[in-house]
């Protein structure tokens, strides 16, 4: 099991390199139909698995196509990561949509409603 500093370093490197690949390295048109942002990367302690959290901005139908494109490009992305980072084995990649970006406004609305309710009770 790798130490936490090594895990964090690999997560940062993966985020940087995958972001670069998404912009310049992958030619699949499906991936370029929506704006993709990597919000975070979580790497397992044994460095064998990585969850890449992404936010997608664009039409819902196109978001699904982007995810299909990413799934099909996994092998290419892993091979490029192994080559660029000079790793014997690159981690198994799992792309997940980051729900935090969409839930943020809902949480703020709830907090604002609670604040208004509290102020009305104080009056």
UniProtKB/Swiss-Prot annotation:
Gene Ontology MF terms in the entry: ribosomal small subunit binding
Coiled coil: none
GO cellular component terms attached to this protein's record: cytosol
Keyword line: Cytoplasm, Ribosome biogenesis
One Pfam family cited in the UniProt record for this chain: RBFA
Gene Ontology biological process terms in this record: maturation of SSU-rRNA
PROSITE patterns the UniProt entry points to: RBFA
Keyword Cell inner membrane among UniProt keywords: no
Domain of life: Bacteria
Localization per record: Cytoplasm
Subunit (UniProt): Monomer. Binds 30S ribosomal subunits, but not 50S ribosomal subunits or 70S ribosomes.
Biological role: One of several proteins that assist in the late maturation steps of the functional core of the 30S ribosomal subunit. Associates with free 30S ribosomal subunits (but not with 30S subunits that are part of 70S ribosomes or polysomes). Required for efficient processing of 16S rRNA. May interact with the 5'-terminal helix region of 16S rRNA.
Family statement: Belongs to the RbfA family.
Protein name per the record: Ribosome-binding factor A
Organism in which the protein naturally occurs: Prochlorococcus marinus (strain NATL1A)
Designated gene of the protein: rbfA
């Amino acid at each position: 099991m790798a130490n936490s500093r090594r895990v964090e370093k690999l997560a940062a490197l993966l985020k940087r390199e995958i972001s670069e690949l998404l912009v310049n390295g992958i030619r699949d048109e499906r991936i370029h139909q929506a704006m993709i942002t990597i919000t975070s990367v979580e790497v397992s302690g044994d460095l064998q698995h990585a969850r890449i959290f992404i936010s997608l901005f664009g039409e819902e139908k196109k978001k699904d196509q982007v995810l299909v494109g990413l799934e099909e490009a996994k092998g290419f992305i892993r091979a490029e990561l192994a080559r660029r980072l000079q790793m014997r084995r690159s981690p198994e990649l799992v792309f997940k949509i980051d729900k935090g970006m969409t839930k943020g406004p809902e949480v703020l609305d709830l907090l604002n409603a609670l604040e208004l309710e509290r102020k009305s009770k104080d009056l």
